[in-house]
């Protein structure tokens, strides 16, 4: 049988938890707005760079088609860049990424896979299954600046150019809007757009020269793509956390209402019992007076 003191303690605890959860929800909402703004502003630029790359590849002279970032080569090692969170309280965010990863590598030989883990949950899963983790990045998405994207891009490009990996895929959440995020698996190295189907025989003049344009352009495209993925991942994580905190807050409010109802019932029962005791005592005193 619950006591008044016990119920009051529970109500106080639920109130404190609700305040914490609501603060976390509010903080996630603030972060989402900032990340969403950056992500949505960058997307048109990223898409236009991809269009430029697509058009460029279809018109490159044959001697430039062997550029190491463009040329397809025999695949011995497949690199997989996995984006997860460092913190929990974000619903099924990490679970969906891990499940997508499992399906993607199903049937592939583990010794041919090289992993780059972003976040604690990717590292934990890959380590517990004895996968080859080339690099681990913990708390990496606390900074989603372009300079941070350049650091990650350099690590990935160095490994690709030095034949540590022969192709690179990324698994992450694309941020579409605050209520919709979707897991994406994309091949980002070598840098051949999927839209390219046939070459065009049109003449283009590159100034000052194609060789002086191609390297920095490919680097800028890759770094921008990585930056976009980082922003999408961070925004999606906060969207999942905000939704999880909202559900937790709503459940806490329901539990709080239920406890208040029980508290009022118990208080009424106790008051009724005390009134009955007083009435009984008065009746007993009247009998004694007679």
Curated annotation (Swiss-Prot):
It is a peripheral membrane protein. GO terms for cellular component: plasma membrane; proton-transporting ATP synthase complex. Pfam families: ATP-synt. PANTHER family: ATP SYNTHASE GAMMA CHAIN, ATP SYNTHASE SUBUNIT GAMMA, MITOCHONDRIAL. This is ATP synthase gamma chain. The keyword Cell membrane applies. F-type ATPases have 2 components, CF(1) - the catalytic core - and CF(0) - the membrane proton channel. CF(1) has five subunits: alpha(3), beta(3), gamma(1), delta(1), epsilon(1). CF(0) has three main subunits: a, b and c. It is found in: Cell inner membrane. One of its GO terms (biological process) is proton motive force-driven plasma membrane ATP synthesis. InterPro entries: ATP_synth_F1_ATPase_gsu (IPR035968), ATP_synth_F1_gsu (IPR000131). Keywords: ATP synthesis, Cell inner membrane, Cell membrane, CF(1), Hydrogen ion transport, Ion transport, Membrane, Transport. Produces ATP from ADP in the presence of a proton gradient across the membrane. The gamma chain is believed to be important in regulating ATPase activity and the flow of protons through the CF(0) complex. GO terms for molecular function: ATP binding; proton-transporting ATP synthase activity, rotational mechanism. Belongs to the ATPase gamma chain family. Disulfide bonds: none annotated.
């Amino acid at each position: 049988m619950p006591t008044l003191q016990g119920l009051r303690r529970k109500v106080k605890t639920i109130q404190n938890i609700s305040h914490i959860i609501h603060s976390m929800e509010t903080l996630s909402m603030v972060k989402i707005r900032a990340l969403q703004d950056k992500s949505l502003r960058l997307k048109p630029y990223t898409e236009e760079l991809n269009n430029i790359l697509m058009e460029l590849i279809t018109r490159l002279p044959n001697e430039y088609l062997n550029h190491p970032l463009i040329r397809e080569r025999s695949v011995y090692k497949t690199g997989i860049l996995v984006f997860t969170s460092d913190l929990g309280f974000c619903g099924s965010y990490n679970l969906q990424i891990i499940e997508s990863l499992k399906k993607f590598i199903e049937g592939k030989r583990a010794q041919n896979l090289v992993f780059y883990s972003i976040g604690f949950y990717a590292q934990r899963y890959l380590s517990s299954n004895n996968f080859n983790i080339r690099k681990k990045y913990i708390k990496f998405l606390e900074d989603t600046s372009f300079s941070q994207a350049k650091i990650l891009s350099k690590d990935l490009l160095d490994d690709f150019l030095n034949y540590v990996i022969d192709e690179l895929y990324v698994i992450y959440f694309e941020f579409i809007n605050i209520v919709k995020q979707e897991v994406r698996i994309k091949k980002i190295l070598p840098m051949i757009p999927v839209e390219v189907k046939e070459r065009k025989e049109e003449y283009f003049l590159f100034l000052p020269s194609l060789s002086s344009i191609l390297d920095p352009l490919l680097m800028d495209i890759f770094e921008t793509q990585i930056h976009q993925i980082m922003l999408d991942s961070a925004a999606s994580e906060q969207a999942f956390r905000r939704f999880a905190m909202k559900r937790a807050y709503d459940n806490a409010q329901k539990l709080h209402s239920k406890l208040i109802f029980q508290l009022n019932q118990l208080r009424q029962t106790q008051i009724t019992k005390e009134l009955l005791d007083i009435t009984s005592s008065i009746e007993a005193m009247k009998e004694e007076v007679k």
